[in-house]
Regions:
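Transit-peptide-like, low-complexity N-terminal presequences
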Residues: 1-7
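Alpha-helical phosphate/pyrophosphate-handling elements in metalloenzyme active cores
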Residues: 28-44, 154-158
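Membrane interfacial helix-start motif at the N-side
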Residues: 7-19, 196
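Intramembrane alpha-helical segments
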Residues: 7-11, 50, 80-163, 167
Length: 203
């Protein structure tokens, strides 16, 4: 039973699929390198690395909670811990709460501005799964949300409104839309069964 729950925890947080962490971490490390002019504070580096893992996992959990019924009907997602019954919804909420509190603790010693930026993007992360219900192109909202690490890192170094931040954020925004649109195509046949029109059709 315990082993089953551990496997479920790993599955719902996607720790067994670290590519999502890399996609969040790489832009954050670039932002850290630019905003500090290569004079990186090790405390900030730890926050960026640990934060990328926690935030990605938190986003995956809340996404699975909101999409549980849809996931049951999609070939690619039907075996996810919530959709398959490996974890209960109450257990998923507990994991989400635990990860959220860990994120809060991680940024508790930061200045006021980066804390507010973190709070703003936290709301977007929670809201993102719901956008797939009413936005024709939710990839755009994901592009805004998943690039959170860039303004957060720049604000940590007091450079939130630096031009280089906006350039990097925009480039990352386009990159996210590109790879997530390609990713969404894998569910195209299932989307035709349960939604109309599909996001890909809008492109």
């Amino acid at each position: 039973m315990i082993a089953k729950k551990i496997i479920g925890f790993i599955g719902i947080t996607r720790l067994d699929k670290p590519i999502g962490i890399y996609l969040l971490l790489w832009p954050a490390l670039i932002a850290l390198f630019i905003s500090t002019e290569a004079s990186i504070y090790y405390s900030f580096l730890i926050i960026v690395i640990v934060g990328s893992i926690l935030v990605r996992s938190t986003g995956c959990v809340i996404n699975d909670i909101f999409d549980m019924e849809f996931d049951k009907k999609v070939e690619r997602t039907k075996d996810r811990p919530l959709a398959s019954g490996q974890l209960s919804k109450q257990e998923a909420y507990f994991i989400f709460l635990l990860l959220s509190l860990s994120c809060l603790f991680l940024v508790s010693d930061l200045e006021r501005q980066p804390q507010l930026v973190c709070l703003f993007f936290a709301f977007l992360i929670v809201f993102y799964p719901l956008t797939k219900r009413f936005l024709k192109i939710p990839q755009v909202f994901l592009g805004v949300t998943f690039g959170a690490s860039i303004p957060i890192v720049f604000s940590m170094n007091g450079k939130l409104f630096d031009t280089s931040m906006w350039v990097l954020y925009l480039a990352n925004f386009c990159w996210i839309i590109a790879y997530d649109s390609f990713y969404a195509m894998s569910d195209y046949d299932d989307c035709l069964l349960y939604t109309s029109p599909s996001p890909r059709d809008r492109y």
